[in-house]
Amino acid sequence: MQFHSSSALITPFKKDLSVDEAAYEALIKRQIFQGMDACVPVGTTGESATLTHKEHMRCIEIAIETCKNTKTPSNSRMKVLAGVGSNATSESLSLAKFAQKIGADAILCVSPYYNRPTQQGLFEHYKTIAQSVEIPVMLYDVPSRTGVSIEVPTALKLFREIPNIKAIKEASGSLKRVTELHYHEKDFKIFSGEDSLNHSIMFSGGCGVISVTGNLMPNLISQMVNCALKLEYQQALEIQNKLFHLHQALFVETNPIPIKMAMHLAGLIENPSYRLPLVAPSKETIQLLEKTLQQYEVIA
């Protein structure tokens, strides 16, 4: 996985709640032009749980096509880490095979939600998916959403026994987990999945981030990651601190509710539309977002 900075892309909808493909392509191009190494379509932030199977595949396809046809400022190609998560192993399997077939660089697979499998069940789930493809696989641990954690011994076993399981997205909120994983396996790539901990994870063995805030501020997220990779601790910390209030504001309600509204307020998407059961943010949240974006000079 030859990338470090990436954004968990939102999925823009039209007023009729169909996917706004033109807006989606424009958002991806903005990521490319502002220095991100990779994009992550149809993860949690992309509202994958309320997309149809066909829509899910189409979003992956748009991301791959856009990255293939749009060069970065350094004349390279932005990578695509395709979200293939589902609470049904068979559906994740289908999405993983599709992503590989059309050219995804790697896949991100969240633990099955609602089912609450045992650790053996998690192992078999990830093993089955990883062995169905040849491209790299990133585990995704976010117990606040899935109801179950990939325990450290399970994650290490998957990394050691399945050759193309290369990385894990850490959204558990536990730096202890990060340090433990890195201590036992230096080559197991750890990506921050929690913007408030980006700096801390990068300096505790992490090698990159998958950011929600990056939808809005890809240049600053990219700069912070690059500073961390060069071991420029203080410079990276200054950027992390600069983003503190924005990180806070974007998670006052369930993600991706605030980030989609912020993107709308910033003029980056036309419609801040959500599919039920997600609904628009409260008036208080909108006011907070407006105030925060003004502080960052995103809006007047």
From Swiss-Prot:
Q: Please name the GO terms that the record assigns under molecular function.
A: 4-hydroxy-tetrahydrodipicolinate synthase activity
Q: Which residues bind pyruvate?
A: T45, I210
Q: Name one GO biological process term.
A: lysine biosynthetic process via diaminopimelate
Q: What is its EC number?
A: 4.3.3.7
Which SMART domains does the annotation name?
A: DHDPS
Q: Which GO terms describe its cellular component?
A: cytosol
Compartment annotation: Cytoplasm
Entry superkingdom: Bacteria
Which Pfam families does the entry mention?
DHDPS (PF00701)
Q: Where is the active site?
A: Y140, K169
Keywords linked to the UniProt accession = Amino-acid biosynthesis, Cytoplasm, Diaminopimelate biosynthesis, Lyase, Lysine biosynthesis, Schiff base
Q: Which InterPro entries match?
A: Aldolase_TIM, DapA, DapA-like, Schiff_base-form_aldolases_AS
The biological pathway it contributes to is: Amino-acid biosynthesis; L-lysine biosynthesis via DAP pathway; (S)-tetrahydrodipicolinate from L-aspartate: step 3/4
Question: Secretion signal: which residues?
Answer: none
Q: Which reaction does it catalyse?
A: L-aspartate 4-semialdehyde + pyruvate = (2S,4S)-4-hydroxy-2,3,4,5-tetrahydrodipicolinate + H2O + H(+)
Site location (Part of a proton relay during catalysis)? T44, Y114
Coarse class of the protein's main subcellular location = cytoplasm
Per UniProt, subunit arrangement is:
Homotetramer; dimer of dimers.
PANTHER family, per this entry? 4-HYDROXY-2-OXOGLUTARATE ALDOLASE, MITOCHONDRIAL, DIHYDRODIPICOLINATE SYNTHASE
- Return the similarity comment: Belongs to the DapA family.
**NCBIfam families xrefs:** dapA (TIGR00674)
Please describe what this protein does.
Catalyzes the condensation of (S)-aspartate-beta-semialdehyde [(S)-ASA] and pyruvate to 4-hydroxy-tetrahydrodipicolinate (HTPA).
Record's protein name: 4-hydroxy-tetrahydrodipicolinate synthase
What is the protein's species of origin? Helicobacter pylori (strain P12)
What is the primary gene name for this protein?
dapA
